[in-house]
Amino acid sequence: MRFYSVLLTIVTLIASTYDAKVNASGIQAIAVSSISHDAPAARMLRADHADERGISVPSASKIVEWMLSPKVAKELTFLENRKVQKWVDKQKTQEYVFTKLGLNSGLDKALSNPKLHVYAAYIDRFNVKNPSNKVALLDKFSEKYTDEGVAKMVEMGIRSSNLETENFASRLWRELLNKWMDNAESAEGVFKILKLDEVGGGIFVTPLFNTWYAFIKEGYTRQAEDVVLRVLSDRYGYDGLSRIFFRGQRNFDLVGDLPIKLETRMVNNWLNKDVSPDKVFKLLKLDEGLDKLLTNSNMQVWESYMMKYNLMPDVEPTTMMQTITRFYNFKELSSMLENAKMVPELNKVAERWQHELRVHYLRAPKMKKEG
């Protein structure tokens, strides 16, 4: 009974210090705000401002569940306990224990290694005995497999059906994020560490995007989506970014509705800055050729923007053809639309465009007179 009384006291103290909800992976998309080139100032706000950095801390009931459940932290057997203590007493190095447990045999094998809990226990006990020379669970994994490799392992582990593997991966994930923040890595820097700069338009398809997003969410005082927008638009341009969003919306199970929210924020930024439909047409590079204009996914973004722009107060409403005919002449458009009508998939949209072009052509002289 005394143990439970002490335990309850500990739980109460922890619960009074932190008021948060459990979030195992910490990777969830939320709404966006304005884009900025701000530096990740939150890196300097370590433990004293944990709540501002979005750190998830279990509630009191969850802590009790965690501390009492043998599934959360696998206990050492008698022999494992003796072995760990022997390594610590004899001052065996991380390298020695890492190799001894076979954790240097490849990422896949390391993740499924049944002795992961033994290595974690060794690290914890080593740090207790050497408080001025502490080491991290992450150290040898990063040294052996690189941060990118560890991130891949973490993403696999967090989704594992094995609770021990999931918890070990979560701890590695936390240490990896803290390492980057302690090293003052930028969003661009971690983007390259994870080799996300090599995946092109498939940015929302790779699970490593989640790790990058989680780092930004914890490492920056600004909303994470703002930073994501800035980095991706700087790298891919708005035309490329719009296409990436289109692809990402088909991977809801991996990134949720983040691509939709980012695209919405991008459009709202333009509206807030009163960017004309003509300018957005160019930003999306829709002025660079008629050949694939009808099938260009960026046209959907532009049309949506134009309609929202026309609803704004104190702006002169425009039409789709008013903008398009500033970049392509009537003859070119007519020819393209006639050819498009021959393609079954494009027939309806081509006919709609053709009708709008005729209406615009008939109204153009009147509009010039009024102007």
From Swiss-Prot:
Induction: Expression is induced during host plant infection. GO terms for cellular component: extracellular region; host cell cytoplasm; host cell nucleus. Disulfide bonds: none annotated. Residues 1-24 form the signal peptide. Its main location: secreted. It is found in: Secreted; Host nucleus; Host cytoplasm. The keyword Secreted applies. It comes from the Eukaryota. A motif (RxLR-dEER) lies at residues 43-53. The RxLR-dEER motif acts to carry the protein into the host cell cytoplasm through binding to cell surface phosphatidylinositol-3-phosphate. Belongs to the RxLR effector family. This is RxLR effector protein PITG_12731. It comes from Phytophthora infestans (strain T30-4) (Potato late blight agent). The lineage of its organism: Eukaryota, Sar, Stramenopiles, Oomycota, Peronosporales.
